[in-house]
């Protein structure tokens, strides 16, 4: 694979591309990566590449030098990628997709960004590595290159490890252990010590499911959606029915019954619940049973609610926040917004127009 990186600071990439796995892949000819200076295509005697934007502070990369730099390295099979927080979030699936390209051009932003006309003219796709702003796009380019290189045959010593690593099946990886069997009183789980591969695989899958559900509910929701037509365990099936259709009844363990009853009654504009039961309106007629457990550890539940239009969607989110609930991230496709109640139970909120 050939990769060209367009940046104002091409030397920024020298050390990372000489080191470790990427460095070895380049030496072996599996990767051909060149970093190029956009200033070479600057305007006038002083090679100007930036200017003040209209009606805005800071400096912006000009369209002409950027377009010239891209066209200088572009060929018929090239894919031009701009690293931007506005782009599609980088995932294992996207990394694998990029690894199939024969020539990638990574455009790194600097200062306040790049003149929009250059992006409209030359860029095929924008990719983000997260919802935050970096000092330059070079860091993001290195992250994407490292992620996609794992899927190029020969780059890793054992290609099978790339397929089995964490995130490849949509779930987080479970814990790993090595010797000694006991460290500071903490023991390796017994199931790993007897060589029963079927039992170990089952244990790893369950730990992976539990860890993803607890730590990354957004990933867990997407995992359930993506596996809709695949065989799943009974536990996953029960949860998926809750996510996709709404089950007839679900138990929410709560710390303070009065607080949760008041919260959900106001959220769904219900009359006071009968016997701690809440009947959620809609096609599925879900019933929520509130069960007070005090300070004991709760069994966290994932639920789904699809609203009829965007106005209802944003009204629901605003009401949730106003009543003291927590708004969390959207899923990686921007289709689902996660919210948490006081006790940590997660709702995946979407609207029909977003699907």
From Swiss-Prot:
Q: Name one GO cellular component term.
A: cytosol
Database matches in InterPro entries: Alpha/beta_knot_MTases (IPR029028), Glyas_Bleomycin-R_OHBP_Dase (IPR029068), tRNA_m1G_MeTrfase_C_sf (IPR023148), tRNA_m1G_MeTrfase_TrmD (IPR002649), tRNA_m1G_MTases_N (IPR029026), tRNA_MeTrfase_TRMD/TRM10 (IPR016009)
GO MF, one example: tRNA (guanine(37)-N1)-methyltransferase activity
EC no. given is 2.1.1.228
Fetch the CDD domains from UniProt: TrmD-like
| Residues annotated to bind S-adenosyl-L-methionine | 109, 129-134
Q: Which Gene3D superfamilies match?
A: 3.40.1280.10, tRNA(m1g37)methyltransferase, domain 2
Q: Which UniProt keywords apply?
A: Cytoplasm, Methyltransferase, S-adenosyl-L-methionine, Transferase, tRNA processing
**Classification via PANTHER family:** TRNA (GUANINE-N(1)-)-METHYLTRANSFERASE (PTHR46417:SF1)
Subunit structure, interactors included: Homodimer.
- The protein, known as: tRNA (guanine-N(1)-)-methyltransferase
Q: Which gene encodes it?
A: trmD
């Amino acid at each position: 694979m050939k990769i060209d990186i367009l940046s104002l600071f091409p030397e920024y990439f020298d050390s990372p591309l000489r080191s470790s796995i990427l460095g070895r892949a380049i030496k072996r000819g599996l990767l051909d990566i060149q970093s190029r200076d956009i200033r070479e295509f600057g305007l006038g005697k002083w090679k100007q590449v930036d200017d003040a934007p209209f009606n805005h502070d800071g400096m912006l990369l000009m369209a002409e030098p950027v377009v010239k730099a891209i066209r200088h390295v572009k060929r018929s099979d090239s894919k031009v990628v701009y690293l931007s927080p506005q782009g599609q979030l980088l995932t294992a699936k996207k990394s694998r997709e990029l690894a199939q390209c024969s020539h990638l051009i990574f455009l790194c932003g600097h200062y306040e960004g790049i003149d929009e006309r250059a992006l409209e003219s030359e860029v095929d796709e924008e990719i983000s590595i997260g919802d935050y702003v970096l000092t330059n796009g070079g860091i993001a380019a290195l992250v994407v290159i490292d992620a996609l290189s794992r899927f190029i045959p020969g780059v890793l010593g054992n290609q099978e490890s790339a397929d089995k690593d964490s995130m490849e099946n949509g779930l987080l990886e479970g814990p790993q252990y090595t010797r000694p069997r006991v460290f500071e009183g903490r023991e390796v789980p017994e199931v790993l010590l007897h060589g029963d591969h079927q039992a170990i695989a089952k244990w790893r899958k369950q730990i992976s499911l539990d860890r993803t559900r607890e730590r990354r509910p957004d990933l867990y929701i997407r995992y359930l959606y993506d596996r809709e037509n695949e065989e799943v365990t009974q536990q996953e099936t029960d949860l998926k029915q809750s996510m996709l259709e709404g089950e007839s009844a679900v138990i929410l363990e709560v710390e303070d019954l009065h607080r949760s009853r008041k919260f959900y009654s106001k959220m769904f504009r219900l009359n006071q619940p009968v016997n701690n039961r809440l009947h959620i309106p809609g096609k599925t007629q879900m019933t929520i049973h509130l069960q007070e457990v005090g300070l004991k550890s709760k069994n966290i539940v994932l639920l789904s609610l699809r609203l009829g239009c965007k106005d209802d969607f944003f009204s629901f989110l605003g009401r949730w926040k106003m009543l003291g609930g927590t708004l969390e991230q959207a899923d990686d496709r921007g289709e689902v917004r996660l919210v948490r109640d006081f006790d940590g139970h997660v709702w995946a909120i979407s609207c029909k127009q977003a699907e």
